[in-house]
Amino acid sequence: MKKPLLLTLLCMILAGCDNPKSLESFTPEMASFSNEFDFDPLRGPVKDFSQTLMSENGEVAKQVTGTLSQEGCFDTLELHDLENNTGLALVLDANYYRDAQTLEKKVQLQGKCQLAALPSAGVTWETDDNGFVVSATGKEMKVEYRYDSEGYPLGKTTINSQNTLSVTAKPSADPRKKLDYTAVSRVNDRQVGNVTQSCEYDAYANPVDCRLVIVDESVKPAVSHHYTIKNRIDYY
């Protein structure tokens, strides 16, 4: 058997010879929603997913679940932050996301299904020419978001009358491992924390299992918190 043919067959058998250039980029909706609602963005034809953050004691700290249309719009999105006893459940209805229980209009949309406004909080979102949310403006604050060429979120800067909080993320140089990243948080240019994450990936280069370490540097000595993230993803 000729070597080129042998290599081709091996690449078909083993998931590891994919050309990184063939990877799908992060959609504007996926990247922007992950920024705003604090979950890891996913690639490809995602149908539904869940991300569960667990403490080192095995307790669920946070869970995010969502369903998406074939066009990449979030049909539903549900978030539960057990550590802070908060939650949110949204369901798509035309140009709004409604509260899944009260049916109150919560989030106004623009374009196909992108964030536009949160009327109750006086927040509006602005997008760039590619449809990514690049800023959020409220009564007393402004947030600016950054992305790389594939749409991966690189962090954000929040500015209010008293402080400037910046989060800067640096993903792995391996394009198939974008969710292996380090991030640094600063308040007024003073570093107050850092985050490191490493993951196992599926054939779509989406994270399956991750290990997350959050270091609080605002206290002395610094305190580290260790988590695991379990992802369940179904595709079209």
UniProtKB/Swiss-Prot annotation:
Residues with lipid group (S-diacylglycerol cysteine): 17
Signal peptide positions (record): 1-16
Keywords: Cell membrane, Lipoprotein, Membrane, Palmitate, Signal
Taxonomic superkingdom: Bacteria
Disulphide linkage map: none
Keyword Kinase attached: no
Location(s) in or outside the cell: Cell membrane
Lipidation (N-palmitoyl cysteine): 17
Similarity remark: Belongs to the UPF0257 family.
Protein name: UPF0257 lipoprotein YnfC
Organism of derivation: Salmonella dublin (strain CT_02021853)
